[in-house]
């Protein structure tokens, strides 16, 4: 038996940015505004989850922050799980949709990349 020490960097995420992203999306799933969810006790608003389109775990590969409005997507719980654990072809459709809606906003935040690069980074395939 050997001991294994693992060091992991966890990047700070802003709860304020997440809440403001939810408000900007009017507490609707940005991939399908028709998706319904339950009302959260803590906010008395539809329960949504914040998804970093480009994962915070990749922050060390970028010279600008990934914890910015343009990179935080308001998703219903089902879409959030699907974008992480769904079939690759379905995830690509979701990521293509996010890129189409967000690429200019990402560029204004200093995050410039092609659609193919975006999908590879978002899927951790680089």
List the model feature ranges, each with a label.
Residues 1-45, 57-67, 122:
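Short, charged surface segments at domain edges that flank catalytic/cofactor-binding sites
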Residues 42-126:
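A detector for short metal-coordination/catalytic motifs
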